[in-house]
Amino acid sequence: EFYVGHNAEDALDRLIRNFVSRMDEERMTQVEESSYSLQEIITIASLIEEETDGTDQANIASVIYNRLEGSGNKQGTYGLLQIDASLLYALPDHTGPITSADMQTDSPYNLYQNAGLPPTPISNPGLASIDAALNPNSTDYYYYALGTDGKHHFSTTLAEHNAFVNSSSYGG
């Protein structure tokens, strides 16, 4: 809780204490044993948080790691995460679907143009997204898209992904 009379420093201190209390020893050990820094894990978790309604975080995490770490051209992704939520972070007044012009936006948060992670988290992720970033599913997925059923559909290859996107099941 925040009270009248609390300043920004009080609020920040409370947020930090809350974060530290939730990032327990087990989670911190997982971070230390990973090849990613705490900031990178939280950045990945923030991408997961903004990309899903909470039903498929571990699969979204798998796609992110596969694109970051995959071999060769990473199934045609070349290390580009191509995450809409990060682009929308760079375009806070954007409405409607993302266009090809939007994908040309000059911003470090445009993961259609910049390989790897954005420079900072794009949101404050919940524990479920942090846990997914620490424990992604082991898959060969490199792509996902939202279906008309409201669920993400995952693909291993660009051909599979394009077939889904061009089907009547694609939800945009």
Protein language model annotation of sequence segments:
Residues 1-172:
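Bacterial extracytoplasmic/cell-wall-associated proteins, especially those involved in peptidoglycan
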